[in-house]
C-alpha cells in the first residue's frame, strides 16, 4: 500500500474548504439580493416590541400630545374660563386655556354613559333594539328639579336605542338613569363601571358619582374631556351619525305607549308638574346649538349646572380634518346667553383651527421596510415606524401657498443600505422626516421589529466575502 501524500491531502482539504466557503458566500450574496420569505415575528416578539416602543416613545403612550414643532400660542376671544382644541387624528393640542382646571362636566357626563353602552353592545350582552324596563326611579316625574328630560313615563315601551337618542339629543337625565339601571342593575354599579373605564384611560382628574351629570361632585378637566372624546370617536365613530348629529327628537310616540295609555288624551299640561303617565309627544331640538349652524359640525354634547356654567364638547370635520374642542365654565345669566356663548366660543376656536392647520396623510410611507442584513442569523431586518399617526398636523402659516399648504410638504426617507451584526427589538435604523419650507414638522423613527442574533464565525466570514469580493 502506497504511503499517503499528506501534503497533497492537506492542499485538497484547504481547496475544499475554500470552495465551500466561496459557495457559502455566493449563496449568501444571492439570497441577500433575492431573499426568501421573511419569517414573521411571533406573538411574544410583537408583545415585546409593543412594550419597548411604549416605554421609549411618548407619542405612543399618550392620548393627547403637544405639537411636534414650536408655534406661537393663539390668543383667541374665548369667553369660557377653560378650553382646549385638538386634532382628532393624532391628539395634537392646538389651543388651550386653563385646560387642567377641574370643573363639573354636567351633562357631558352622558358621553361616558354612551361609551359604556357601546362597550356592552360590542360584547353582545345587550342590543340596540332591547326593550328596557323602566322602574319608578327612571320616570321623568321622579327626576330632580330643573332636570333635562326625555320624558320617560309609567308603562312606556322604550328601546335602548331610543334611550341613547334621548341621552345624546335632549340630554335626558331620566334616559341616563334608565340606561344605568338596565346595563348594571343600578346607579351605584354603573358608576363603578364608569370610573373603572376612566381609570383604564389614565384620566386621573375625572371622577363620577352619578350618571346624568346633575351632581356638582362629578369632576373632569377640559384636557381629560378632550382625551376621552378622542378615544370615544375613534372607537365608536358610528355614535356621530346615529346619535350626536341628529337635530331633534320626539318622545313618546304612539309605539312607546301601552295599550291602556293609548286611549288617554295626547295633550297634557306640565305647568303644574310632570305626571306619571306621559302620553303627549314632546319635540326637542338637539341641545348643541352649532348643529345645522356651523359647517361640518356633527356633535358632540352640551352640559350645564350652576356650578359648571355652560359646557360644550364640540366636534367639526372639514376637508378630511376633524377638530375636537372643549369649552367649560361658559358664561350666561340664562339659557339664551349660555347658548350664544357656546356658539361664539365654538365658532372662534373652530374658525381659527381650520384656518391655521391642515391634516396631511401619506399612509404609503408608514409601512414596513426590508433592509439587507449581514453578519447575522437572518438576511433581512424589517423596519417599522415607531408610531403611526393617522395624519400630520401641518401649520398653514409656515407655507408660502396658504391655499394649498399640503403641496409644499417634503418627505425625506432615510434608510441604511444594509445593517451589520445583531439587531435588538425597537432599535432605530432610520427615520421618515416631514418638512415644510425647511422647518421640520415631524420625524418618525424606523425601528427593527424583532431581535436577530449575530451569525456564527463561518457565516460572518462568508458575508465578508459577499461584501467585498462579490461587490455586495
Regions found by a protein language model. Name each.
Residues 2, 33-226, 230-235:
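Active-site-adjacent loops and short helices of periplasmic peptidoglycan-processing enzymes
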Amino acid at each position: 500500500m502506497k504511503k499517503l501524500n499528506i501534503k497533497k491531502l492537506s492542499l485538497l482539504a484547504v481547496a475544499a474548504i475554500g470552495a465551500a466557503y466561496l459557495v457559502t458566500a455566493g449563496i449568501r450574496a444571492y439570497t441577500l439580493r433575492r431573499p426568501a420569505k421573511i419569517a414573521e415575528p411571533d406573538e411574544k416578539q410583537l408583545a415585546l416590541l409593543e412594550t419597548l416602543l411604549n416605554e421609549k416613545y411618548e407619542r405612543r403612550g399618550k392620548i393627547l400630545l403637544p405639537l411636534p414643532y414650536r408655534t406661537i400660542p393663539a390668543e383667541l376671544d374665548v369667553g369660557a374660563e377653560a378650553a382646549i382644541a385638538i386634532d382628532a387624528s393624532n391628539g395634537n393640542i392646538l389651543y388651550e386655556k386653563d385646560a387642567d382646571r377641574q370643573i363639573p362636566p354636567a351633562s357631558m357626563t352622558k358621553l361616558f354613559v354612551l361609551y359604556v353602552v357601546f362597550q356592552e353592545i360590542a360584547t353582545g350582552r345587550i342590543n340596540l333594539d332591547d326593550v328596557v324596563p323602566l322602574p319608578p326611579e327612571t320616570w321623568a316625574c321622579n327626576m330632580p328639579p330643573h332636570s333635562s328630560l326625555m320624558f320617560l313615563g309609567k308603562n312606556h315601551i322604550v328601546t335602548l336605542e331610543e334611550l341613547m337618542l334621548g341621552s345624546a339629543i335632549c340630554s335626558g337625565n331620566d334616559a341616563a338613569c334608565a340606561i344605568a339601571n338596565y346595563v348594571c342593575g343600578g346607579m351605584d354599579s354603573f358608576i363603578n363601571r364608569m370610573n373603572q373605564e376612566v381609570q383604564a384611560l389614565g384620566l386621573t382628574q375625572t371622577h363620577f358619582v352619578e350618571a346624568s351629570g346633575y351632581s356638582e361632585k362629578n369632576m373632569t378637566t377640559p384636557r381629560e374631556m378632550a382625551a376621552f372624546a378622542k378615544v370615544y370617536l375613534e372607537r365608536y365613530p358610528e355614535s356621530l351619525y346615529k346619535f350626536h348629529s341628529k337635530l331633534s327628537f320626539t318622545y313618546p310616540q304612539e309605539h312607546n305607549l301601552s295599550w291602556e295609555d293609548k286611549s288617554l288624551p295626547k295633550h297634557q299640561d306640565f305647568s303644574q308638574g310632570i305626571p306619571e303617565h306621559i302620553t303627549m309627544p314632546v319635540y326637542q331640538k338637539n341641545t348643541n346649538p352649532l348643529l345645522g349652524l356651523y359647517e361640518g359640525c356633527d356633535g358632540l354634547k352640551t352640559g350645564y349646572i350652576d356650578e359648571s356654567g355652560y359646557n360644550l364638547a364640540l366636534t367639526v370635520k372639514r376637508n378630511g380634518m376633524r377638530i375636537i374642542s372643549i369649552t367649560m365654565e361658559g358664561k350666561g345669566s340664562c339659557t339664551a346667553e349660555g347658548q350664544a356663548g357656546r356658539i361664539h366660543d365654538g365658532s372662534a376656536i373652530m374658525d381659527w383651527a381650520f384656518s391655521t392647520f391642515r391634516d396631511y396623510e401619506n399612509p404609503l410611507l408608514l409601512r414596513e421596510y426590508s433592509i439587507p442584513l449581514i453578519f447575522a442569523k437572518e438576511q433581512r431586518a424589517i423596519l417599522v415606524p415607531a408610531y403611526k399617526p393617522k395624519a400630520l398636523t401641518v401649520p398653514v402659516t409656515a407655507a408660502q401657498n396658504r391655499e394649498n399648504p399640503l403641496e409644499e410638504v417634503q418627505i425625506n426617507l432615510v434608510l441604511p443600505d444594509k445593517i451589520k451584526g445583531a439587531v435588538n427589538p425597537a432599535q432605530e435604523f432610520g427615520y421618515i422626516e416631514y418638512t415644510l419650507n425647511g422647518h421640520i414638522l415631524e420625524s418618525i423613527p424606523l425601528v427593527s421589529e424583532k431581535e436577530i442574533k449575530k451569525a456564527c464565525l463561518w457565516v460572518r466570514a462568508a458575508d465578508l466575502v459577499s461584501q467585498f469580493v462579490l461587490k455586495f
